[in-house]
Design a protein with these regions (language model features):
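Histidine-rich, glycine-flanked metal-binding segment
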Residues: 20-31, 40, 44-85, 102
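Extracellular/periplasmic ectodomains of large secreted or surface enzymes and adhesion receptors
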Residues: 20, 28-30, 69, 425-457
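His/Asp/Glu-enriched, well-ordered alpha-helical/loop segment
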Residues: 24, 100-101, 107-120, 259, ...
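Divalent metal-coordination and catalytic microenvironments
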Residues: 38, 53, 58, 81, ...
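C-terminal cap of metal-dependent C-N hydrolases
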Residues: 38-41, 387, 399-443
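Polyanionic/metal-chelating signatures
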Residues: 132, 137-288, 419, 425, ...
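Sec-dependent N-terminal signal peptides
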Residues: 4-13
Length: 457
């Protein structure tokens, strides 16, 4: 009998240590490239004119003036009068879970069957042949974060992916990037479930729902930790707690292994969500949409919470009315410039022009009296979303040792006339506007010219 218990115990350990749906991402073949004489916005708040950038082995090697390389195999790109930036990162995307063409049978972003569906993962809905990926790549997007929708109080896990079209989602997943947890407050969950005659039907019902879920997660985690603290002998005669996929996700949040991203519009609700997080000892990474974030910008900065916001979209529903165009700038400049502002898309068209969205937000901020440089605004679509996705140590800025996610622009990236000419992911060319090199999805196969007469191009 003891031998049998030992075998069962060993099997339990093997199952627990297996990471489900791990990334199998492999980068494309990278090149050794020296960009010379370019104007660089490095994603760290610096503007460097007539500067060189060296990349090799998929990494940023050096940045500065007059870089010389003796290697005959190095490729020289003259970037004079052009601009170089880090690859753009969108922290709020639904590409893949709401793919194009938009048909009901592929609308897989909301598991609107229960107010709390922490057990679902956005990556399990993603269609890897969504033609929107390639269109985003043409706009300089090298990384994007896919979230479930906002029908539920707790909608499930989000995933960060590299913008390289592959045949499996695992081969697109950003290696070792943490999952996120998508939560939503306000009108959406109370409308979806209130219209069915069930809870929540009010904002107070929303908050009761969050707290109930976290209490369950705390109890589940306590049981797991109590079992883990037992001796090997005790584990051989006692069964571990029954596994629960929903509570697995929530307990991982409490262990700081999953990043919390919250769809929320009104200032007082964001403040209440911060209180809920403090009650259950987890951290909020970012509030998304947040049209009233400007009202509590200092509170967000004090708590290290980013505002992932639209540049100029509001008024489409009641809770989205009270916005100002300087919203992003105000969040950015909170507490003497210690705020974390992010420009997000939440839209398959907006993601193609996230640089222009940042330009609009910067212009509105400067019109309101803030002195925001292009270099500072570039952080809103590069290093700040990298921080919110938990991948800042690897990407988001042009710093030696980081991944060579690089965009070469035809001109000032904040100009509506500028286009991404070349996009590199991990030092490998992923898109070249001049030659037409780039991915073609299954949806585009058979079209003589995928760019012709396409609404989203």
């Amino acid at each position: 009998m003891k031998k049998l218990f030992f075998v069962l115990f060993s099997l339990t350990i093997n199952v627990d240590t297996f990471a489900a749906f791990e990334s199998t991402y492999e980068p494309l073949q990278s090149e050794k490239i020296l960009f010379i004489n370019g104007n660089i916005l490095d994603g760290e708040g610096n503007e460097l004119l007539d500067t060189d950038l060296l990349i090799a082995d998929g990494k940023i090697i050096a940045i500065g003036k007059g870089i010389s390389v003796e290697d005959k195999d190095v490729k020289i790109i003259d970037a004079k009068n052009k601009w170089i930036t880090p690859g753009i990162i969108d922290i709020h995307s639904h590409m893949g879970v709401y793919p194009a063409p938009s048909v009901r049978t592929s609308s897989d972003g909301n598991e609107a069957t229960s107010p709390v569906t922490a057990e679902v993962w956005a990556e399990h809905s993603m269609w890897v042949q969504d033609p929107q990926y390639a269109l985003a790549l043409k706009g300089g997007i090298t990384t994007f974060h896919v979230l479930p929708g906002s029908a539920n109080l707790i909608g499930g896990r989000g995933v960060t992916v590299k913008n390289l079209q592959r045949n499996t989602i695992q081969s697109m997943k950003y290696p070792d990037a943490k999952h996120s947890l998508k939560m939503a407050c306000g009108e959406n969950p109370k409308r979806v479930y209130g219209n069915r005659g069930q809870a929540p039907s009010t904002r107070m019902g929303n908050f009761a729902g969050y707290r109930k879920a976290w209490i369950e997660a705390e109890n589940y985690l306590n049981k797991l930790e109590a079992y883990d603290s037992k001796s090997d002998e005790d584990k051989m005669v006692e069964s571990p707690p029954k596994r629960d996929l929903r509570l697995d996700t929530l307990s991982d949040v409490l262990k700081d292994e999953i990043l919390v991203h919250i769809h929320c519009y009104r200032a007082e609700e964001m403040a209440l969500m911060i209180d809920v997080a403090k009650e259950f000892n987890y951290k909020i990474t970012a509030f998304h949409h947040g049209v009233e974030a400007y009202k509590i910008a200092d509170l967000l900065a004090d708590n290290g919470i980013c505002g992932a916001l639209w540049a100029d979209w509001w008024g489409f529903k009641h809770e989205a009315y009270d916005m100002v165009q300087a919203n992003i700038a105000i969040v950015d400049q909170a507490r003497g410039g210690k705020g974390c502002a992010i420009v997000h898309s939440d839209d398959e068209r907006g993601i193609q022009r996230l640089n222009q969205e940042a330009a609009k937000a910067r212009a509105a901020g400067n019109k309101a009296g803030y002195d925001i440089s292009k270099a500072r605004a570039m952080n809103w679509i590069t290093s700040n979303p990298a921080k919110a996705a938990g991948i800042y140590d690897e990407t988001g800025s042009l710093v030696a040792g980081k991944n060579a996610d690089v965009v070469l622009w035809s001109g000032d990236p904040f100009s509506v006339y500028s286009l991404a000419e070349q996009v590199f992911i991990d030092g490998a060319l992923a898109f070249d506007r001049n030659t037409g090199f780039g991915p073609v999805s299954d949806f585009d196969v058979g079209i003589v010219d995928p760019r012709e007469d396409r609404v989203n191009d």
